[in-house]
Regions:
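All-alpha amphipathic helical-bundle segments outside canonical DNA-binding/catalytic cores
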Residues: 57-64
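An anion-binding catalytic pocket shared by soluble metabolic enzymes
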Residues: 69
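Amphipathic, coiled-coil-like alpha-helical segments
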Residues: 1-22, 33-44, 48-50, 72-87, ...
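Short amphipathic alpha-helical boundary/capping segments
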Residues: 24-25, 29
Length: 118
């Protein structure tokens, strides 16, 4: 991943945009090398947090990891991940909340970032 490119947003059929490059640019003050670094960290951290959400037996721990994922995603421009994590956080009272939409949002966003170079 050596540059930031592609359209400002890539939206799925409905819901939040998959990725908002303008948000990333704002957060990094337009610094391309910082954008590359932030995206690399985001990609690793999003997977780590999702794994922790999936593995958490304790609802409180799951909620904490979801809040971390929401903040990370919003700051980086991964709007769909933030939206799906927020929806899951709202449904966390359920004993077995459906993690599939969030896992799919992460997979789609990471695939997009890998495909476009950011």
């Amino acid at each position: 991943m050596d540059r930031i490119g592609g359209p400002k947003t890539e939206a799925p059929a409905k819901g939040a945009p998959l990725f908002d490059a303008a948000q990333l640019k704002r957060q990094t003050h337009g610094n391309p090398s910082l954008q590359v670094e932030v995206l690399a960290l985001f990609m690793a951290e999003a997977e780590r947090l999702m794994n922790q959400v999936e593995d958490a037996a304790d609802p409180q721990l799951r909620a904490e990891r979801l809040r971390a994922l929401i903040g990370l995603s919003r700051n980086t421009g991964a709007a769909l991940i933030a939206q799906q994590a927020r929806a899951l956080e709202t449904a966390i009272a359920s004993e077995n909340p459906d993690l599939t939409p969030l896992r799919a949002a992460i997979a789609d966003t990471l695939a997009y970032l890998k495909r476009t170079g950011g």
